[in-house]
């Protein structure tokens, strides 16, 4: 609606604010359109960069490649009535541009001159809206000067054309034929020609209504009847001023829930406005959108809009652009599009397509150029919709809307019931080239794609052949809906108890509109039925909340997503990050009571309350079952009641107090109206005082009163928009003068907006990653989920693409970032070839050390080009956009994103060549701040490349570090190694003897978890003391250290020939290219201190019972926490079981406590004790001396597991066997049984001191209770831990 509350109480009472006439000003003559200056500027800059400019006159700004009849000329607002109203100031520039977006058009008697209607919206910078409705028709040009000027232009055009195309006969350059599509010159001159002696010249003129609300059908009817009065042979009953005066001053704006009838020139006009508890006013035909695009394309476009992609609609018809844009935004209820919204983009604002912000714009097509001729600045995040050719291009990685199949089916059933083919004209990108060869006129009756002209009945007969429709019909029949001829002549849902006062076709449009909208609204009501539970109300006052809004979390996204079904997550996780969702939640926080609520929010909340009441559901109880819409009948009935019983009939048009004889009627010409009677309304508002209370019911006075008191809400909205700008510094293009300074200022706002968005996005990602935000708000420890992380990274990639697309000289490829990288790579290779660049920075160190026992791995060189090559070698990535995103992910994982981009932008000559002066990447200060913000990502660890590209081949580099003092060079056995990760494990890799460093390639293993290392015990000296093993991912640079510090050899330590080592990721130092990987380990859990060399359990420092209890409690607590996290957040369970502070180590300390010291230098291990206990219980079983059945089962299980571990073919040693037994006991929930069994075993008395923990019944019972907490969890063991055992 129109914004502001200024202008007094009459502001909301009028149906229309202005009547406007636009057209040719015969006094100023023919002027080139406003685009000419801008075109010259753009084309001149392209010419400097080697692009081919169009040929234009430097003096006139005219394009001689186009015939004068095809050119557009400046239109002007010729008249407006009244001059101004306080509550809706007249915006002459905007109205002029949008009434005639391409300026004036000329035609001759040979051209079709049908009148064209279109609606438009003027969105102010504060987000408020005014609606316009324009009817464009053609009038004969009576001015001799204009006709002579057109004739002169044709002479100039023909002369210029002959000069330009003279070389064509000699086979010269043919670039000038672009507009003529290869037509010979003489033929082209006859086409669209004008001869003053034999042709009649016509020029476009536009009549327009500017209104506070979008009553499209009523305004169209008003304008069409006015035009009919002008073109009719007979004059209208009254002067035109009477009808225009009536609609401006005597037709009121219906209040919510009311209907209105008023008179046009030839017939009554009816409009109705939904009540405050219904869906908001929407007066465009949804049917047309589904017929033009088809259900599938509408859903894809709808999803793109919800995720705030850039959307560009493309059509020859302005009204189609408007209908599609308004329909898509209306279907979003209760969410509202928050970004640039220009459904009809005036030709003079084409530079706005360069905007690096989300937008929804409509671009007019001339009907001749196809998609390939459109040079769009950025396409990586663009949804392009060719409305006339029923074709849509989607951004990559578009997630599917939740329950899409059932949703599509429900919508299709409604469409079929109204005779609308649900399968529209669906085409995928592969058929784009074919589409370009099909003329739009041929598509009108193309039976193959479902775009059927004619009545619904004929459409139905033709669609019977269609397989998809047949399947949908079968689905509908199963639901009990009759499809006999689709009831095209009579609507089964119409109510026979009353007669509506509009024609049947109009009623069916109302019914289809409300049914489709109710179904879409129901989806959001079901999906967000519990949203209020997750809104975090601010604890501070409003002023503080506004000030710190960007640092606050106002919706518990992690908890909300954890409640959602898995298939919903890809869409919902991205949707929760959008501006429209943020604004929706802001509105919720600002509205403390129902009276204060935003009207849209009030309607949505009432529906949510109704659903909860009907389903008797609690906030935590949700279902993923698809629930159909049940509110259609009620909504339909409300509309039908308003149309059957009109609440008010406006005053009929009447003779005005005006001079007789002025405005002489002349068929075919819109008369000059008498401004003295149209510029002022009634002197005293008697009509309002007399009729308003009687006709509009009493409660509507309350409604008007609340509208006066809404200043507070306007202020609230202003605060919200300021607080949640999120980088969209400029929300709407100002439709005003287009001087270079204005364009420069607009671009500067874009630059500032991009920088702000970058700052907000990096901060959001860091806060989520570190989990600080939720902790500060008192929600405990919250980690980001994999889905959320992917969403935020995808959002960062979108931002980078928009930054790299801003101010491009010439678009090359769909990804501006990847295009820039390729240019940089090409430049570097050229310099390398010429020898002007050193190769040392990009070569990997391939040295192969044999016997150096240092724990230092040769550094991995930093190289932007090498990282590009890694991406280029991945065959699974086919597109430039995909490659750019993969490169960003890899750079983030390597903590090199800021550094790489700084290196990329350091080639200033390349940047100047690729970008215009105003581009973000050429604003030095902002660019530096941008790179600084990206540098903050180095503070956290991302695995966004490793976890996404799971099937690619990765080279891994291994370094084995033996003890410096013992057993290095004399080792004679043949070693082997096997590496395991979260995504898989390698086969056993044989290591050449005396080789300590090697590289191999295998499918991505993910984060590495364990290394199994061993040897075949061959040769004279088969004893090996290994300090640690290091493994590096050669693509991501992640280096893992697997400490060992134990012997591998018979008769040494516990006699093990192989060991399972649990690893940790080493963090990298800031200058990774200058320092080796001698780095501290990443902290895996609180108070973890890793020793460089692990020592055998017998020699570990002894802990007291309190410390042992604490370590077991912490180990078990770590496992419990692991399982309480969402599955995608969980770390390595292997580390929690077998790591330094894992369960195995803690239980090892418990069994070591009070263990009797061995004599005569003989080592005794815990496994020796367990074997003796097994022998004891087996003997008892043989003698049938078992106390009870329970005890018998536990003893038998214990013996079975110990025997199975002892019989494993692996040479894992006694400590390895103990580790395996503990892991198996944890998996099968038997540990607490075994502890109780061993505590009562007589063997314990022989092998343990009296002070031992295992002999203290109180401590044992406490230990059993702790271990029992693991019973509820399903523990899955890494295959490396239980390899070779089948139990």
Curated annotation (Swiss-Prot):
GO terms for molecular function: guanyl-nucleotide exchange factor activity; small GTPase binding. The keyword tRNA processing does not apply. Residues 954-1062 form the PLAT domain. Residues 57-259 form the uDENN domain. GO terms for biological process: negative regulation of neuron projection development; retrograde transport, endosome to Golgi. The modification Phosphoserine is found at residues 193, 1085, 1087, 1096. Changing residue 932 to S: Abolishes the interaction with RAP6A and localization to Golgi membrane. Keywords: Golgi apparatus, Guanine-nucleotide releasing factor, Membrane, Phosphoprotein, Repeat. InterPro entries: cDENN_dom, dDENN_dom, DEN5A/B, DENN_C, PLAT/LH2_dom, PLAT/LH2_dom_sf, PLAT_RAB6IP1, RUN1_DENND5A. Residues 278-414 form the cDENN domain. Interacts with RAB6A bound to GTP. Guanine nucleotide exchange factor (GEF) which may activate RAB6A and RAB39A and/or RAB39B. Promotes the exchange of GDP to GTP, converting inactive GDP-bound Rab proteins into their active GTP-bound form. Involved in the negative regulation of neurite outgrowth. Belongs to the RAB6IP1 family. This is DENN domain-containing protein 5A. It comes from Mus musculus. The gene is Dennd5a.
């Amino acid at each position: 609606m129109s914004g502001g509350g200024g202008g007094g109480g009459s502001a909301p009472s009028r149906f229309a604010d202005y009547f406007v006439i636009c057209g040719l000003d015969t006094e100023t003559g023919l002027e080139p359109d406003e685009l000419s200056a801008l075109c010259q500027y753009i084309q001149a800059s392209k010419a400097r960069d080697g692009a081919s400019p169009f040929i234009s006159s430097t003096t006139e700004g005219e394009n001689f490649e186009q015939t004068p009849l095809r050119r557009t000329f400046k239109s002007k607002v010729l008249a407006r009535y009244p001059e101004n109203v306080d509550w809706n100031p007249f915006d002459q520039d905007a109205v002029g541009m949008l009434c005639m977006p391409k300026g004036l058009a000329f035609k001759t008697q040979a051209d079709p001159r049908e009148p064209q209607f279109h609606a438009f919206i003027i969105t102010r910078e504060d987000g408020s809206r005014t609606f316009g409705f324009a009817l464009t028709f053609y009038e004969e040009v009576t001015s001799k000067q204009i006709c002579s000027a057109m004739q002169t232009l044709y002479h100039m055009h023909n002369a210029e054309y002959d000069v330009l195309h003279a070389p064509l006969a000699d086979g010269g350059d043919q670039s000038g034929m672009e507009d003529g599509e290869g037509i010979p010159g003489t033929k082209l001159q006859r086409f669209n020609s004008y001869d003053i002696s034999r042709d009649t010249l016509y020029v476009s003129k536009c009549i327009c209504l500017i209104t506070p609300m979008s009553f499209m059908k009523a305004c169209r009817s008003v304008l069409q009847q006015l035009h009919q009065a002008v073109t009719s042979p007979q004059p209208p009953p009254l002067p035109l001023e009477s009808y225009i005066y009536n609609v401006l001053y005597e037709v009121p704006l219906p209040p919510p829930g009311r209907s209105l009838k008023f008179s046009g020139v030839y017939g009554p006009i009816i409009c109705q406005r939904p009540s405050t508890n219904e869906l908001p006013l929407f007066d465009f035909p949804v049917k047309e959108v589904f017929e033009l695009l088809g259900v599938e394309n509408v859903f894809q476009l709808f999803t793109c809009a919800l995720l705030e992609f850039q959307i560009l609609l493309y059509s020859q018809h302005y009204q189609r652009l408007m209908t599609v844009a308004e329909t898509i935004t209306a279907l979003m209820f209760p969410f509202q599009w928050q970004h640039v919204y220009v459904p009809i983009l005036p030709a003079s604002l084409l530079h706005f397509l360069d905007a690096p912000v989300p937008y929804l714009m409509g671009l007019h097509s001339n009907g001749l150029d196809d998609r390939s001729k459109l040079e769009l600045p950025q396409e990586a995040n663009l949804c392009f919709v060719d409305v006339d050719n029923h074709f849509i291009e989607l951004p990559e990685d578009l997630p599917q809307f939740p329950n899409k199949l059932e949703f599509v089916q429900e919508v299709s059933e409604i469409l079929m019931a109204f005779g609308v083919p649900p399968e529209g004209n669906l085409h995928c990108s592969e058929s784009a080239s074919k589409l370009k060869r099909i003329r739009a006129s041929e598509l009108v009756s193309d039976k193959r794609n479902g775009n059927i002209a004619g009545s619904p009945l004929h459409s139905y007969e033709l669609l019977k052949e269609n397989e998809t429709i047949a399947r949908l019909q079968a689905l509908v029949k199963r639901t009990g809906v009759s499809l006999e001829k689709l009831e095209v002549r009579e609507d089964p849902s119409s109510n026979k108890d009353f007669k509506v006062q509009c024609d049947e076709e109009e009623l069916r449009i109302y019914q289809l509109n409300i049914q489709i909208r109710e179904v879409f609204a129901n989806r959001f009501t079901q999906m967000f039925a519990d949203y209020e539970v997750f809104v975090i109300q601010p604890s501070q006052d409003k002023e503080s909340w506004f000030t710190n809004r960007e640092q606050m979390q106002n919706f518990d996204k992690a908890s909300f997503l954890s409640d959602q079904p898995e298939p919903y997550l890809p869409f919902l996780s991205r949707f929760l990050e959008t501006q429209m969702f943020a604004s929706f939640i802001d509105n919720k926080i600002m509205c403390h009571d129902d009276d204060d609520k935003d009207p849209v929010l009030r309607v949505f909340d009432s529906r949510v309350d109704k659903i909860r009441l009907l389903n008797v559901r609690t906030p935590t109880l949700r279902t993923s079952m698809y629930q159909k819409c049940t509110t259609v009948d009620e909504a339909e009935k409300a509309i039908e009641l308003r149309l059957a019983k009109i609440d008010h009939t406006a005053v009929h048009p009447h003779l005005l107090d005006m001079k007789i004889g002025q405005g002489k009627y002349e068929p075919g010409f819109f008369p000059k109206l008498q401004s003295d009677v149209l510029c002022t309304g009634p002197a005293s508002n008697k009509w309002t005082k007399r009729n308003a209370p009687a006709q509009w019911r009493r409660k509507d006075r309350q409604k008007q009163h609340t509208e006066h008191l809404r200043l507070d809400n306007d202020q609230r909205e202003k605060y919200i928009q300021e607080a949640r700008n999120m980088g969209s510094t400029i929300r709407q293009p100002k439709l005003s003068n287009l001087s270079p300074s204005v364009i420069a200022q607009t671009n500067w706002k874009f630059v500032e907006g991009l920088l702000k968005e970058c700052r907000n996005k990096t901060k959001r990602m860091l806060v989520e990653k570190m989990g600080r935000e939720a902790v500060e708000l008192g929600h405990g420890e919250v980690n980001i989920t994999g889905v959320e992380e992917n969403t935020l990274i995808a959002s960062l990639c979108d931002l980078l693409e928009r930054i790299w697309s801003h101010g491009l000289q010439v678009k090359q490829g769909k990804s501006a970032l990847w295009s820039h990288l390729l240019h940089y790579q090409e430049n570097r290779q050229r310099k390398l070839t010429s020898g002007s660049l050193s190769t040392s920075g990009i070569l990997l160190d391939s040295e192969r050390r044999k016997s150096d026992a240092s724990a230092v791995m040769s550094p991995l060189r930093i190289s932007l080009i090498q990282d590009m090559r890694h991406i280029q070698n991945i065959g699974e990535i086919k597109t430039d956009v995909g490659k750019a995103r993969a490169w960003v992910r890899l750079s983030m994982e390597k903590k090199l994103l800021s550094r790489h981009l700084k290196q990329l932008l350091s080639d200033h000559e390349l940047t100047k060549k690729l970008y215009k002066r105003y581009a973000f990447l050429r604003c030095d200060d902002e660019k530096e701040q941008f790179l600084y913000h990206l540098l903050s990502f180095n503070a956290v660890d991302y695995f966004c490349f490793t976890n996404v590209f799971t099937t690619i081949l990765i080279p891994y580099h291994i370094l084995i570090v033996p003890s410096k003092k013992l057993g290095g060079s004399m080792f004679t056995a043949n070693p082997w190694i096997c590496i395991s990760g979260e995504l898989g494990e390698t086969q056993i890799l044989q290591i050449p003897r005396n080789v300590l460093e090697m590289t191999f390639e295998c499918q991505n293993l993910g984060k590495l978890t364990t290394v199994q290392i061993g040897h075949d015990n061959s040769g004279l000296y088969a004893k090996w003391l290994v300090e640690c093993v290091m493994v590096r991912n050669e693509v991501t640079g992640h280096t893992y250290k697997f400490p060992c510090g134990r012997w591998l050899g018979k008769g040494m330590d516990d006699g093990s020939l192989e060991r399972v080592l649990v690893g940790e990721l080493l963090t990298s130092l800031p200058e990774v290219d200058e320092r080796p990987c001698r780095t501290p380990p990443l902290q895996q859990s609180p108070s973890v201190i890793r020793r460089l060399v692990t020592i055998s359990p017998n020699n570990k420092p002894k802990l007291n019972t309190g410390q042992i209890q604490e370590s077991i409690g912490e180990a078990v607590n770590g496992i419990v926490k692991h399982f309480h996290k969402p599955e995608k957040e969980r770390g390595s369970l292997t580390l929690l079981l077998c790591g330094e502070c894992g369960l195995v180590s803690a239980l090892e300390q418990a069994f070591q406590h009070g263990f009797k010291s061995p004599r005569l230098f003989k080592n005794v291990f815990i496994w020796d004790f367990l074997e003796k206990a097994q022998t004891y219980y087996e003997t008892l079983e043989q003698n049938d001396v078992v106390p009870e059945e329970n005890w018998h089962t536990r003893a038998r299980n214990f013996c079975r597991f110990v025997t199975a571990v002892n019989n494993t073919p692996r040479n894992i040693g006694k400590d390895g066997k103990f580790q395996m037994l503990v892991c198996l006991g944890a998996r099968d929930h038997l540990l607490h049984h075994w502890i109780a069994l061993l505590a009562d075993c007589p063997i314990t008395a022989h092998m343990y001191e009296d002070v031992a923990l295992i002999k203290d019944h109180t401590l044992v019972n406490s230990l059993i209770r702790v271990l029992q907490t693991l019973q509820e969890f399903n523990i899955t063991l890494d295959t490396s831990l239980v390899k070779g055992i089948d139990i």
